[in-house]
């Protein structure tokens, strides 16, 4: 009996907060690569931000829940939020690989800049063996260097990296946090449900 293998995109991040840039990128990539769904995974205790203040994981997870309402192709996961200690991508992918083995192929969505950090990830060679990557290239980013990096990682480590071009969206979580702190509007930068949650919980005021 032939099994219809699904294609699942994975978008991990601190999401502090999640914003419309994340959602637009995910939707464009979902359509371009015919992904059956995109799984949003808020980080629990990210090791690369251990010297930074990160909003409580429950708040960040709740904002992701609010942001994904209304899109049947977007799902959220508590897999990292519920894990104690630092959360590493290899551990998350190991669990997802077991869960979806033979059922779905995993596509990990990253920004082009992350291509240059992949070799600092814990057990990165195992990561390359578990999933394919979709690297999002924004306008104005050096395409030649981007493709050279992809070729190097594929040739040297047998990584599988697909290229996605997305529009330039000048929104960042840092910008949103700063605007809230300064009493400025964040309307149209985040979904209205996320804006309301931030106001209700009094986030980013300090």
From Swiss-Prot:
InterPro entries referenced in this protein's UniProt entry, alphabetically? Cyt_trans-like (IPR004821), NadD/NMNAT (IPR005248), Rossmann-like_a/b/a_fold (IPR014729)
Q: Does the keyword NAD apply?
A: yes
Q: Which UniProt keywords apply?
A: ATP-binding, NAD, Nucleotide-binding, Nucleotidyltransferase, Pyridine nucleotide biosynthesis, Transferase
Reaction equation(s) it catalyzes:
nicotinate beta-D-ribonucleotide + ATP + H(+) = deamido-NAD(+) + diphosphate
- What's a Gene Ontology MF term here? ATP binding
Task: Please give the pathway this protein is involved in.
Answer: Cofactor biosynthesis; NAD(+) biosynthesis; deamido-NAD(+) from nicotinate D-ribonucleotide: step 1/1
Note the SUPFAM superfamilies from the entry: Nucleotidylyl transferase
Q: Does the keyword rRNA processing apply?
A: no
Q: What class of enzyme is it?
A: transferase
The name on file for this protein is Probable nicotinate-nucleotide adenylyltransferase
- Look up and give the organism this protein is from: Acetivibrio thermocellus (strain ATCC 27405 / DSM 1237 / JCM 9322 / NBRC 103400 / NCIMB 10682 / NRRL B-4536 / VPI 7372) (Clostridium thermocellum)
Q: Lineage from the top down?
A: Bacteria, Bacillati, Bacillota, Clostridia, Eubacteriales
